Amino acid sequence: MDFITITSSNKTEEFALKQVAKQATSSLMYRLGKTIILASVCVEREPVGEDFLPLVVQFLEKSYAAGKIPGGFVKREGRAQDFEILTSRLIDRTLRPLFPKDYRYPTQITLMVLSHDVENDLQVSALNAASAALFLSHIAPIKSVSACRIARIGNEFIINPNTSLLNQSSLDLFVSGTKESLNMIEMRSLGQQLNALEEPLMLKALELAQKSLKETCTLYEEIFTPHQNELLFKESQGIIFNERLLDLLKNQYFDEIIKGIESSALSERENVFNEIARKISEAHSEFSLKEIELSLEKVKKTEIRCMIIKDKIRPDKRALEEVRPILIESDLLPMAHSSILFTRGQTQSLVVGVLGTDNDAQTHESLEHKAPIKERFMFHYNFPPFCVGEASSIGATSRRELGHGNLAKRALETSIKNKDQVIRLVSEILESNGSSSMASVCAGSLALYASGVEIYDLIAGVAMGMVSEGQDHAILSDISGLEDAEGDMDFKIAGNLEGITAMQMDTKMSGIQLEVLYQALLQAKKAREHILKIMHEAKEKIVINFSHLPTTEIFNVAPDKIVEIIGQGGRVIREIVEKFEVKIDLNKPSGEVKIMGNKERVLKTKEFILNYLHSLDQELEQYAIDEVLEAQVKRIVDFGAFLSLPKGGEGLLRKQNMDRCQVVLKEGDSIKCRVISFNKGKIALDLA
């Protein structure tokens, strides 16, 4: 076993090599404080025939890592939690650009959290563990990467804060990359205020992150290189194209290729290129269909890049900084609390807002919290197949849908003034031609306002792209699906006029330089200003229907009265909810009663509850200690019998009192009893 210790960027990491999981291609035990992660890489020796990178990343949390047993009926880990899926995506998006373009060997990277001490950052630890395991595997010529998190407390940036410091921060910036450039960025604002970060400060934070990554990656390469396995798969020379076929495409089918490029819909574009491939295949049998498709893809990509970089024009004829036409409609769904239809070009998001009570909040188990945590603001993103013209079934929520919903949530969360309010936004993507997550942010912000939710400001989102060729590059505002597919960067940025509340950057290159990112940030600000102007105009036309929105009424009763509102087995509370069609949250320790629903029904419910409690008090006042009564058995329970009293109300005759007198009762019996006490609004009885 080899044991390695590396200290950099405010952390000391320990790596135990060749200790466990030795049948994997490579494996290691990563340790930071009391956080321990097992990282393994497994590679199959036979490549797949399809043209894609068969990489799978799985991040798994074990409950025992925090000394806990899983909640719920089944006491073992089951379906992956949201945090596990989002962390898997985070690692995948960092590592994927590092692989050679022609790498086709099925590869699985598994990260198992075996111990977690709460204070250390699981996502940074997991990515660094995955990077080290992948670098040591030497399955291909892959650079070393690392991750860091940047927080901001006051005016000070902090590298790799612990959980306590991050909870005080107004910024959560996660960055990964090599020693030369950045591969992936996730950012959100934190705190009770909006805390949007201005572009110059964002650049400063990214510079700090890059400095940290350079230090860590340099150490990783120096220390891990002697421990690498033998290189398994050398990078090939790539695809060798038939020049005669390329000339044929450029000379005889160029106009049709341009027509396909300029087709705005994905389904229409695919039909054009499929038809070109079919024609060539029928006319030139010497070329295989696969060869034709690859050559067609190369010509298409070359022409798109030439069009953008040299001619400064995009496939849909827009200028580089031009945003597609925007149309905003509101109040489409009469029964929802709000609904906004946001259309930008051929991308369309219908966001529906619903307000709820504490009982409606989503609960999650987490290694970092002893008790389940409540998610009060939920943003769910759905991408049905018909939005891109595909005929396929709608299945379970995909990783992509979860990730896009999480991004939109992060963009909007700090714009909400009352963080205790329970809100669910659902984005239904009805059409998609790029930037659907950012359309969801725009529609979601307006949906919050239309729901009567107090917000600090409207938030707009825009997806930026980049096309590069050698030393030349072009930044694109509001990218389409084609520009996303053929471009080198997908940089989603959301915020208001003052700054950024969330962003996410992915690249298909080995990394992006800071100066390019800053150019994209400034260009995105212009696009955001344009979109926000249209959103503010739409906001002025929104009429909030307060009579339809749920009202919340909060009042307090004596804590011992809460059990009276609940009733035996929840009978009373169920009857109240069914009768008035409201939602009720009860807090036993404080005696707080929260009612939510239609305003008129809420007020009637409050009146009913107070009158009900008052009537119970009056019933108690009719009886005195040691008073002898003739009562009737109402119902028998395990611990005794409830008796109907002659002047109203009921009392409890406990089982031990019945046993002492050797009395056997059945429902309907009449019996003499004596009042012995009043306990929390209950009358306790004994046999007379």
From Swiss-Prot:
Keywords: Cytoplasm, Magnesium, Metal-binding, Nucleotidyltransferase, RNA-binding, Transferase. SMART domains: KH, S1. GO terms for biological process: mRNA catabolic process; RNA processing. Residues 626-688 form the S1 motif domain. Its cofactor is Mg(2+). The keyword Magnesium applies. It comes from the Bacteria. Its EC number is 2.7.7.8. Pfam families: KH_1 (PF00013), RNase_PH (PF01138), RNase_PH_C (PF03725), S1 (PF00575). Involved in mRNA degradation. Catalyzes the phosphorolysis of single-stranded polyribonucleotides processively in the 3'- to 5'-direction. Belongs to the polyribonucleotide nucleotidyltransferase family. This is Polyribonucleotide nucleotidyltransferase. It comes from Helicobacter pylori (strain Shi470). The lineage of its organism: Bacteria, Pseudomonadati, Campylobacterota, Epsilonproteobacteria, Campylobacterales.
